[in-house]
From Swiss-Prot:
Protein name: Envelope glycoprotein D
InterPro entries assigned: Herpes_glycop_dom, Ig-like_dom_sf
Cleavable signal peptide: 1-30
Intravirion-side segments: 380-383
Organism classification: Viruses, Duplodnaviria, Heunggongvirae, Peploviricota, Herviviricetes
Length: 383
């Protein structure tokens, strides 16, 4: 383009308008990011991803958990796993001051080399004297990895999950991390699948492996890839139960209608379990002899289960923490906290996306018509 043309007032005005419009777009994005609503790596912008930092998962994993639980699933059995149980005393303690606080519930699948793959996450903001997590005024949508996890609130505590028709590839250790204000509660659940359930979906552990992060990466970030957004738990329940019925039909083709049995309930012990003394493990890798997963296998067929832990990313420091297995309750429904005898007059929590401050909203509303109109006029006249 000739220099004379580039210097014309129309051309300069066109470039100025385009630059102004670009500045407006960047300003709006900066307002959203500055308000704590950064888009997730999975590009799901209406999820409050990363608002509550997880912290160093290696430290959480190497410390003694508040609850330990062993779960054995037979074939296409379904089970409600609620290791932490009633959280009302924790919520009451954090809310005693009357100050707002945040909370989060995250389940991880833990690989033998101590790599954490999130399978469920939900966050709660603006919690003011809540009786249960759902009383918080702002709640993020449900985020799931795969459709065989369902109904995080069936157990009543708001932190449990239901497992339906897991296959043997998902045998291993699951870690629950619940943060309520300044309080953290953890649980390690060893899931052993006895008997195969038909697979009606893609290779699951491969997907989890591709989306697992090392412990210290969770201190400053969170990987949202591989997780799916469900606006309502009813939508997720419909999808997962349909997949579960398909599995049952494959397992029992002669059945006219695939029945969905009532789930078994697995809950944690009433008191914190005291771990045994740490025992050194002599092994060249992260796997125990005769234990394909390296986690959650019996030590001598009669002793307690164990879990490998690695501290400070030193792969030579592999230790085994053994603990007494809890006594499992009789099969039956998980409790329902909503029927605890109190009335809840709070408004329904809102599922919201990234939050934007009032100043940013006013600025966008005032400047948008002017900038868009100026840009359109200039482009029509000079470009």
């Amino acid at each position: 383009m000739p220099a004379a043309t580039m210097a014309t007032p129309g051309y300069l005005a066109c470039r100025t308008s385009v630059a102004t419009l670009l500045f407006f777009v960047l300003l709006r994005r900066a307002a959203i990011l500055g308000a704590g609503g950064a888009p997730s790596p999975a590009r799901i912008v209406d999820y409050l991803i990363g608002y509550t930092r997880v912290g160093d998962m290696d430290k959480l994993y190497s410390q003694y958990a508040d609850r330990y639980l062993d779960v054995t699933l037979h074939g296409c059995e379904r089970a409600v796993v609620d290791p932490l149980g009633d959280m009302r005393h924790v919520l009451a303690s954090e809310g005693a001051s009357g100050q707002e606080f945040t909370a989060s519930v995250i389940w991880y699948y833990v690989f033998p080399d101590v790599c954490f793959a999130p399978v469920f996450r939900r966050e709660y903001l603006r919690c003011i004297r809540p009786r249960k997590l759902e009383d918080c005024y702002t709640t993020s949508p449900f985020m799931w990895t795969r459709e065989f996890y369902v109904d995080a609130f069936l157990a009543g505590s708001g932190t449990g999950i239901e497992l339906l028709g897991l296959n043997k590839k998902l045998t291993g250790t699951y870690m629950l991390v619940v943060r309520v204000g300044t309080t953290t509660r953890t649980a390690l659940v060893t899931v052993n699948v006895v008997g195969e359930c038909p697979t009606t979906m893609e290779e699951v552990t491969t997907t989890l492996r591709g989306n697992c992060w090392r412990g210290r990466q969770y201190t400053t970030d969170f990987n949202g890839d591989g997780m799916y957004l469900f606006d309502t738990e009813e939508e997720h329940r419909r999808i997962v139960y349909k997949a579960y019925q398909d599995k049952l039909k494959v397992a029992s083709p002669n059945a006219t209608d695939a029945p969905i049995s009532y789930p078994r309930a697995y809950t944690g012990a009433d008191e914190r379990l005291a771990p045994y003394t740490l025992q050194p493990v002599s092994t060249d890798d992260h796997y125990l002899p005769g234990c394909p997963w390296g986690i959650g296998c019996d030590l001598d067929q009669t002793s307690a289960s164990g879990v490998i832990e690695i501290e400070d990313h030193d792969e030579s420091d592999v230790r085994l923490v053994s603990y007494p297995p809890p006594t499992l309750p009789s099969p039956g429904p998980g409790g329902n906290e909503n029927g605890a005898g109190y009335s809840d007059n709070r408004p329904d929590p809102k599922v919201v996306g990234p939050t934007v401050g009032p100043g940013a909203i006013i600025l966008v509303v005032m400047c948008a018509p002017i900038l868009i109109g100026l840009t359109a006029f200039t482009i029509r006249k000079y470009c």
